[in-house]
């Protein structure tokens, strides 16, 4: 008898593709690793993945994790098909749950209703009130995204979706911990929070390039994300610790 051991896989159905250009994002540059269009998961690949994942997973609760880039760029139809596939391939003793991480800017009433209907846990990336969030979390035009993210968050709240907030700790918000916490608790009504330190390691020779931040669609050269220096966006040990 085959003994199945629980395991986790983070699935990126759009690869590194994202509609934002957050200045500290370590993943945007991964777009250069793919041929044009090759980073999008096809529905055929999705079916093979779901079948193999559920076959390899034990009975009981099984969680599938969806991330990006920005996973909602793949479209609602893709995730509706995912639900059909999970129902087709799960064993009777399996309960399939889904967790998705999003920047929140593309979440509409329709998306929120879908997440609620299918029991998704949705993590939304927010770095605090508008001046702190917009310091680094910008769109392709370099403009702040806070208002768009909050609209998405409010749609999720109205639909009753289980949510949490993913907040990076960076040079812009590191000295405003109490303000950020109260904003999440009192204004957004968040119950679960995750804090992720931004530490952008870089070699001295690449520091000037790293300070500019990655921009999608540019011809910027890649650089190694290691070294003895850190960018000015990085949090300090004292502030984070």
Regions found by a protein language model. Name each.
Residues 122-123, 150-153:
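A conserved non-catalytic segment of reverse transcriptases
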Residues 1-102, 106-113, 118:
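Conserved alpha-helical substructure of the radical SAM core
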Residues 31-32, 71-73, 104-109, 121-143, ...:
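Conserved radical SAM core fold
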Residues 140-147, 154, 158-241:
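Radical SAM enzyme [4Fe-4S]-AdoMet core and its adjacent flexible, acidic
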Residues 116-122, 188-189:
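Glycine-enriched alpha-helix->loop->beta-strand junction motifs that scaffold or abut catalytic
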Residues 9, 62-64, 98-102, 122-124, ...:
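Hydrophobic faces of well-ordered beta-strands that scaffold small-molecule active sites
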